[in-house]
Amino acid sequence: MTKAIRVRYAPSPTGLLHIGNARTALFNYLYARHYGGTFIIRIEDTDRKRHVEDGERSQLENLRWLGIDWDESPETHENYRQSERLDMYQKYVNELLDKGLAYKSYVTEEELAAERERQEAAGETPRYINEYLGMSEEEKAAYIAEREAAGIIPTVRLAVNETGVYKWTDIVKGEIEFEGGNIGGDWVIQKKDGYPTYNFAVVIDDHLMEISHVIRGDDHIANTPKQLMVYEALGWEAPEFGHMTLIINSETGKKLSKRDTNTLQFIEDYRKKGYLPEAVFNFIALLGWNPGGEHEIFSRQELIELFDEKRLSKSPAAFDQKKLDWMNNEYIKNADFDTIFALAKPYLEEAGRLTDKAEKLVELYKPQMKSVDEIVPLTDLFFADFPELTDAEREVMAGETVPTVLTAFKEKLEAMSDADFVTENIFPQIKAVQKETGIKGKNLFMPIRIAVSGEMHGPELPDTIYLLGREKSIQHIENMLNQIQ
């Protein structure tokens, strides 16, 4: 590429970092790093009604947690928040007004709503009808004077070229074209409060920041022709555009919605649950992009090297929670113990389970964790009440040799001293029961496991018995014998 690559992620500080926005940031980051370009963070805070206190800090903090870094941002550069650039926007509003390419509009919200209602009732596509249509210059001046005398504050609208055609070659979707007559009429570029609208401000920002490529979600496709109109009106060259497909819920096939409370959708949620940032980064990178091949686990550097915008998918990206859980489990299994133990400690401490056996518990359950917060329910066996048996477990415990196995193993545990009661000495006791009773395989191990833990599956049986403790293991076996005899 001969053009200097400059891309941006431009969030509105209206809440937490959604996984869709995180994907936008991540793909722009990969694009910049792959081509040796510049990645910029710009804060689009012109929608004051939706502004959330601390929203900007939350966005940046969660991006950092993911491992996304940037070259330019409000932290290092002046006027990288739209609210700091109002004079700049005003300059270009004035330029368009002076050229006759924009005009002040005094139509009220009530009048717009009434006209929209009339159009819908008539089966027409709602659009703005120029309020000055058919007026002479004298009538226009009188209309403006009357409106201003009534205290009506105008907006500024861009005069749309209804016969114009606005097209671009999309990086993801190929050729896209809109006719000027289908945009909805002249549209507002400056609101009554003096703030620019999104589609105007973003053009000024992207041009002045020399953005070369705009990579964003395909919900912005309808915004692009309006932005191209502003580029045209100001005589500027537009950047290249790429619109990523929407993210759908793999279970419902519907667009991932923030209202879907059954799906974790905010990066903050994954942080709190103990997902590893490397796993979440890896997972998001594969939402709508495929490097080819069957391999799915990639380091950040591998993703940077492999990234190719030509492999961005035209089909919706499926958000599969089970796949993310699998991927996170792979990262947890391969992470060093100290990292996982440090992450697990706060969960254990909050649950009152940070005992002298905590390290052994984390070591035992590390391979099973889909998220680090699962260390608490996984260790219920050692701290909570004995669980109610399932029908399958009851069926096992109804076997005729079960009392023999449990009685023999209980006697072995009772004969062990506290000093002898260590993990490596427990398995030989089980083998001794096998030798004495002639009972082996599942008929030997399964009754002991269920009697001790209340579960058919779990960590290695000697580890489970050791962590439960000799006295508690004996007590559980006695309780089970009382139930089945």
Curated annotation (Swiss-Prot):
Whether Protein biosynthesis counts among this entry's keywords is yes
The answer to keyword Protein biosynthesis applying to this record is yes
Q: Which GO terms describe its biological process?
A: glutamyl-tRNA aminoacylation
Q: Which EC number(s) are documented for this chain? A: 6.1.1.17
EC class of this enzyme? ligase
Keywords per UniProt:
Aminoacyl-tRNA synthetase, ATP-binding, Cytoplasm, Ligase, Nucleotide-binding, Protein biosynthesis
Catalytic activity line of the entry: tRNA(Glu) + L-glutamate + ATP = L-glutamyl-tRNA(Glu) + AMP + diphosphate
UniProt-annotated binding residues for ATP: K258
| Motif 'KMSKS' region positions after renumbering to this chain | 255-259
Q: Where is the protein localized?
A: Cytoplasm
Q: Which family does it belong to?
A: Belongs to the class-I aminoacyl-tRNA synthetase family. Glutamate--tRNA ligase type 1 subfamily.
Subunit-level organization: Monomer.
Q: What does this protein do?
A: Catalyzes the attachment of glutamate to tRNA(Glu) in a two-step reaction: glutamate is first activated by ATP to form Glu-AMP and then transferred to the acceptor end of tRNA(Glu).
This protein is called: Glutamate--tRNA ligase
Q: Which organism is it from?
A: Streptococcus sanguinis (strain SK36)
- Which gene specifies this protein's sequence? gltX
